[in-house]
Amino acid sequence: MNESKILNDISEIKTLMNRSSKFLSLSGFSGILAGIYAIAGAYIAYIKVEDYKTHSFRYSKVLEMELFFIAIAVLVLSVSTALLLSYLKAKKNNEKIFGKGSRNFSFALLTPLIIGGIFILLLIRLKIFVIIAPTTLIFYGLALLFASKYTLGSIKYLGFAEVLLGLLAMYFIGHGLLFWVIGFGFFHIIYGTLMIFEMKNREKVNE
């Protein structure tokens, strides 16, 4: 048995271990679309807020509910798109969408998101709206950092960027919507585009 064959065998074993323990079917296109959804949602929210300022007789509770449903709509669209595109990519790569890797990834991602979601609901209940945008960015970034162990390692850079942006948003209070657009909109589009190029380069190397 020559040295090159041994190295090939080791490489194949590492690949199999990665496939079983990591979720490698994230789609760059889902990141781009999530960014577009976020920008569209933020634009609609901006219009609603400006309309409320113009017509101050409107009940603030109505505005709160409208903004809440806009956020939920963006979240549902983003998650649905990510699940669909990841499923199609996993099917193409013969990877189990509900395998050990995806379970590890989901648990690591959802734990900070659920904790952050509960914290944000408490902020809403206490009517502390000014730090909601920074809080969403920070908890989302932490979720990506935790989940990066179980997927493409490069996702941790997006996580760091989201956390830092959230801290900046906490410092520059009153510009939450702008930071939200940058973090959930433009950062997602940039990262999704880079992920597509990264995956194409990997495919070329493996050919």
Question: Model-flagged regions — what are they?
Answer:
Residues 19-26, 60-67, 97-101, 122-132, ...:
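Membrane-interfacial loop-to-transmembrane-helix junctions in polytopic alpha-helical membrane proteins
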Residues 22-113:
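Selected alpha-helical membrane-embedding segments in polytopic membrane proteins
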Residues 35-45, 75-82, 113-117, 137-140, ...:
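Helical transmembrane-bundle signal
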Residues 29-32, 69, 104, 131-138, ...:
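Alpha-helical transmembrane segments of integral membrane proteins
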Residues 1-27:
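N-terminal juxtamembrane cytosolic/stromal segments of multi-pass membrane proteins
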Residues 94-148, 152-155:
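Membrane-proximal helix-loop-helix units in multi-pass membrane proteins
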Residues 140-207:
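Terminal transmembrane helical module of multi-pass membrane proteins
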Residues 46-54, 87-94, 124-128, 149-153, ...:
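Transmembrane helix-loop junctions in multipass membrane proteins, especially transporters and channels
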